[in-house]
């Protein structure tokens, strides 16, 4: 529910801001990896002071640039990346996470685990540290002091950054446990992803950290695979963040 209310008001503020910027002819650039057509239509319309809606073209390719000078609207399509991955989705019980990680890392690998609350991330991190898994382990969440968070994010980039970056020192085995901070802004690459259920747009953001770069993968992790955590407790704390209806609706749309 908190997430739904936040998004509702944020969208209203964004549209009003765009209408003001459009009125003063201020150039604006909006970037998104998961922008539905209807949402893009509302944003462009707000900038054009509620001008006529864009005609949908669902067959058009992505990625795409939509441009307006307030007089007309143009779209420019770009060729897709040659790297096309099909991600396998599976469920994993919360009680089986440590065992699954240990099994999947039999030949090495870098695993990302994204949880929806700080307390759950801390708890799982402690369980992994107490297990017999041999790997570098890092914990990242929003409640660290800014200086500590910057330091940890720098470590994560160094471990999981682009192969072309000379600063990247990818280890043979590592596990990064974190919250939503891992789905935003960090250009990092996991061999395997385990995540709490979240709204589909955010789930896609998380999956975007899986097999992100071209590199040789450990045996058994050659193909991108994402485990969605199946929780048995009735009071799922994720529902307090995203809302029960939204999570259940999006869970039904995820094909496993």
Which residues does each predicted region cover?
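Residues immediately C-terminal
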Residues: 2-8, 36, 120, 184, ...
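Post-DEXD/H (motif II) to motif III coupling segment of the RecA-like Helicase ATP-binding lobe
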Residues: 3-75
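Loop/turn-to-beta-strand initiation segments
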Residues: 24-29, 110, 171-175
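Conserved interdomain linker/interface between the two RecA-like ATPase lobes of SF2 helicase motors
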Residues: 26, 51-121
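Ser/Thr-glycine-rich phosphate-binding loops at phosphate-binding pockets of nucleotides
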Residues: 31-35, 177-181, 195
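C-terminal helicase lobe and adjacent C-terminal extensions/tails of nucleic-acid helicase motors
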Residues: 40, 99-169, 190, 194-256
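Conserved two-lobed SF2 helicase motor
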Residues: 167-183
